[in-house]
Amino acid sequence: MASHVDLLTELQLLEKVPTLERLRAAQKRRAQQLKKWAQYEQDLQHRKRKHERKRSTGGRRKKVSFEASVALLEASLRNDAEEVRYFLKNKVSPDLCNEDGLTALHQCCIDNFEEIVKLLLSHGANVNAKDNELWTPLHAAATCGHINLVKILVQYGADLLAVNSDGNMPYDLCEDEPTLDVIETCMAYQGITQEKINEMRVAPEQQMIADIHCMIAAGQDLDWIDAQGATLLHIAGANGYLRAAELLLDHGVRVDVKDWDGWEPLHAAAFWGQMQMAELLVSHGASLSARTSMDEMPIDLCEEEEFKVLLLELKHKHDVIMKSQLRHKSSLSRRTSSAGSRGKVVRRASLSDRTNLYRKEYEGEAILWQRSAAEDQRTSTYNGDIRETRTDQENKDPNPRLEKPVLLSEFPTKIPRGELDMPVENGLRAPVSAYQYALANGDVWKVHEVPDYSMAYGNPGVADATPPWSSYKEQSPQTLLELKRQRAAAKLLSHPFLSTHLGSSMARTGESSSEGKAPLIGGRTSPYSSNGTSVYYTVTSGDPPLLKFKAPIEEMEEKVHGCCRIS
């Protein structure tokens, strides 16, 4: 038969030929198709006959075989007592189980097959066999309320205090009243008390704690994993063994170890509904956002709504704590960054430490105040020249600057009457004071005392005056240049000729405070007198200032002598 390409080529050619030839070509192709179909049917029939001959001559063969455990469980599930007896006679163990740990006795107790139960027990089946969740046949019979099977199992020695993985005993799971009465009667007959029940409940955890202590004593790794990748903390978390988990966590086991399925201990606690265990793990750093290999978080594995609400609350609290810690770390980083990289360690001080620190600071300040007061008292009794003491770094600043210039008109001109040791006639007396000046370059100058300056030609009408240097007491820091200028001004006050002009100037300043203030001391010109004269002095020496006269000396002297009186 022609291929598809040949048919397309032939079709293009047939479009150009007459109708009669196209009809003949179509008949030819149809005959070829029928011939091909007949050949296919003949081959198919031949293959069928050949296969039938093989089946008839080959005989019957066994192709499927089952394990003994599967066959025994399947016969027990079908309640086929004869087949079960056949397997038991052929030395098949009655304790064979499937992948869930379920034995034939478990299955018969669930389905209430009393005959097979007796048959299995008579052939030595384990009456206390446990599946993967530690359920015994008595657990199954009590849960289903099969009172007849409960009696048979107790007669064969079933453990009435067997505890499953959920911590439940058979009487905890029994809801049928007659069956529960039988179990409680058997427990009372065996002398089981509440204390013994409590001991049996905590026995698995106590055994695990004892094993952990043995591992610690032997120096073994507490993060040991089993064949499924589970650690001791996984087991404690799944079973709710709080004391065992606390012991493991106290010895530094990891809370983020995953088994082969990607489960952490918190996932196991969430899946089996261990609420207190989940809180304990979260408090030790377990992540509520950890995911398994199936992309499941602990909250996704919860079945109880109450437990889900608890995990959501724990997650919210954890997020709040992490945000507060992040803000605290950022504030600490800002504080330490300003201090430079000096290798200091930032730690949080307790309330008592901060209180003691404040108390020490207050005591230090009190001592400094007491020392300064005593020094003021000592220096106030001394009358002499100004003595200047300076530190080793006084000449480090080559360009000292006046921090706060003081106007000469701001000097007070009155002295309180209580501070006068003698009546003021033609001069003013300044009291003694002592204080310190801090220089701009870090040096400290101490003025131990201020000598008494008597103005030879002072204003007799002024009753009292404040110390001329009292305005400098709060002006700090001072420079060496300023101290030299102050010393020059002090010598000016003690000069017998220049005191005349200063005395009259101070008196007028005290009388009319609304007049314009004098220029700064550090200026080039400083008018000290009211008669038109200006005082010039050098800024680097302690010599008395120079006078610049704008009028004849005789006229100035006449004005000076005219404003003074002799008493």
UniProtKB/Swiss-Prot annotation:
Coiled-coil annotated spans: 15-55
GO biological process: establishment of endothelial barrier; positive regulation of blood vessel endothelial cell proliferation involved in sprouting angiogenesis; positive regulation of endothelial cell proliferation; regulation of filopodium assembly; regulation of phosphatidylinositol 3-kinase/protein kinase B signal transduction; regulation of sprouting angiogenesis
Keyword Cell membrane carried by entry: yes
Chain residue ranges for the region called Disordered: 378-403, 504-525
Record PTM Phosphoserine, positions in chain: 69, 333, 337, 350, 476
GO cellular component, one term: nuclear speck
Chain positions of ANK repeats: 100-129, 133-162, 228-257, 261-290, 530-559
Main location: membrane
S-farnesyl cysteine lipid modification positions: 564
Compositional bias (Polar residues): 504-515
The protein's role, per its UniProt record: Regulator of protein phosphatase 1 (PP1) that acts as a positive regulator of pulmonary endothelial cell (EC) barrier function. Involved in the regulation of the PI3K/AKT signaling pathway, angiogenesis and endothelial cell proliferation. Regulates angiogenesis and endothelial cell proliferation through the control of ECE1 dephosphorylation, trafficking and activity. Protects the endothelial barrier from lipopolysaccharide (LPS)-induced vascular leakage. Involved in the regulation of endothelial cell filopodia extension.
GO molecular function: enzyme inhibitor activity; myosin phosphatase regulator activity; protein phosphatase regulator activity
Residue numbers with lipid attached (S-palmitoyl cysteine): 563
Membrane-related topology note: Lipid-anchor
InterPro entries given in the database record: Ankyrin_rpt (IPR002110), Ankyrin_rpt-contain_sf (IPR036770), Pase-1_reg_su_16AB (IPR017417), PP1_Regulatory_Subunit (IPR051226)
Cysteine methyl ester: modified positions: 564
Protein name in the entry: Protein phosphatase 1 regulatory inhibitor subunit 16B
UniProt biased composition (Basic and acidic residues): 385-403
Organism: Homo sapiens
Quaternary organization: Interacts with PPP1CA, PPP1CB and MSN. Interacts (via its fourth ankyrin repeat) with the mature dimeric form of RPSA/LAMR1. Interacts with EEF1A1. Interacts with PTEN. Interacts with ECE1.
Modifications made to the protein after synthesis: Phosphorylated by PKA and, after PKA priming, by GSK3B. Phosphorylation by GSK3B reduces its association with PP1C and enhances PP1C activity. Dephosphorylation by its associated PP1C results in enhanced association with PP1C, but reduced PP1C activity.
Subcellular location: Cell membrane; Nucleus; Cell projection
Alphabetical UniProt keywords: ANK repeat, Cell membrane, Cell projection, Coiled coil, Lipoprotein, Membrane, Methylation, Nucleus, Palmitate, Phosphoprotein, Prenylation, Repeat
Propiece residue ranges: 565-567
SUPFAM superfamilies in the record: Ankyrin repeat (SSF48403)
